[in-house]
Regions:
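Active-site cofactor/cluster-binding pocket
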Residues: 1-226
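Ferredoxin-type iron-sulfur electron-transfer modules and their immediate structural context
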Residues: 158-159, 171-323
Length: 324
């Protein structure tokens, strides 16, 4: 089971993985891919099955042996360990390492790892992709890590076949793109294993933070966004049986999934506000501050341009939780 971000290449890589395994072994394969309505930048989940006998399962994977979480923010947004079998394997794409990773993992996740004897691997595929020149396309790196960790087919054969698919998929884009993806395959082996502390089994799961958001957001919208919409009772939709939906619910999402966020440079800013105008997620916001609002602030500002803003300051602020 693979959790990814729309347009990060996870789904495409998994389609290739199924073809590689199906074409080069006697195993039976099955794959299903689910997406949310955001498309690029949205939630994706790949459900893959491999076996030595015909697969007749007509439902999603609910008890996987292997789970890969390609977006570290998902640890706090979704129940990514749900159903992961005892003695299973978990792969995480993260910027954290070692003790820092252990510190930042939610207690719920650490508790599950310890109670179910999960083998945990991690890799900073985001950093590797940047170093190679692939931008946010972490798919090939993580696909390579999957084959190396699971051993579902011999690693040498997997590498050979992945590189064949790279030529098929990216050959028309030029030799440079092909070579970058070759490098991604080779660097997929840079994963590390996280030591799971048995003491984690006794950790208390953190309670959800209290908020003053409307009941509709907490009781309907958030469970749906957390991929738990199937668990909602019919009574949750009382009053909206006709499909009516409240407006402005997106402002409560605050997903925080951006690996990189733009930084305002006051030295080159001419206060044209075009950056805010073209930002498709309204994450770049210009502000004009009066003396009271500016008092005690420790962030850089500029003298606001325009007679109507005399004595006021200007700043552009990026909302890292809304950025994509």
């Amino acid at each position: 089971k693979f959790y990814g971000l729309g347009a990060d290449g996870t789904v495409g890589a998994n389609k290739n993985s199924v073809k590689i395994i199906g074409d080069n072994t006697n195993k039976y394969c099955q794959a299903y891919f689910s997406y949310d309505s955001k498309k690029s930048g949205g939630f994706t989940c790949s459900h893959l099955r491999f076996g030595d006998h015909p697969i007749r399962s007509t439902y999603l994977v609910t008890t996987p042996n292997f789970v890969a979480c390609h977006v570290q923010a998902y640890l706090h947004m979704y129940d990514v360990t749900r159903g992961l079998r005892k003695n299973g394997t978990f792969l995480l794409n993260t910027i954290w390492e070692g003790e820092e990773l252990a510190k930042n993992l939610p207690n719920k996740v650490k508790k599950y790892f310890a109670e179910n004897n999960i083998t945990v691997y991690y890799i900073n595929a985001t950093k590797i992709a940047q170093e190679i020149g692939l931008g946010n396309r972490t798919n090939t790196i993580l696909q390579s890590a999957f084959f190396r960790i699971t051993g579902v087919i011999p690693v040498d054969l997997a590498v050979e076949q992945m590189k064949k698919f790279i030529v098929k998929s990216y050959g028309k884009k030029g030799e440079d793109v092909v070579n970058k993806n070759y490098a991604a395959v080779d660097r997929g082996g840079e994963y590390k294993q996280l030591t799971v502390d048995p003491a984690w089994a006794s950790l208390e799961v953190e309670a959800a933070a209290a908020n003053n958001d409307p009941a509709f957001i907490n009781e309907v919208v958030r469970p749906i966004n957390a991929q738990d919409g199937d668990l909602l009772p019919v009574s949750a939709f009382k009053g909206i049986e006709d499909g009516t939906w409240h407006q402005g619910t997106a402002k409560y999402e605050k997903r925080g999934v951006a690996a990189f966020v733009p930084e305002w440079n006051p030295e080159t800013c001419i206060q044209c506000n075009k950056c805010a105008y073209v930002c498709p997620h309204a994450a770049i916001r210009p502000f004009v501050l009066d003396a009271n609002e500016q008092a005690g602030a420790n962030f850089p500002t500029l003298k606001a341009v325009g007679k109507q803003f005399d004595g006021m300051t200007f700043r552009v602020q990026v909302d890292v939780m809304d950025c994509l």
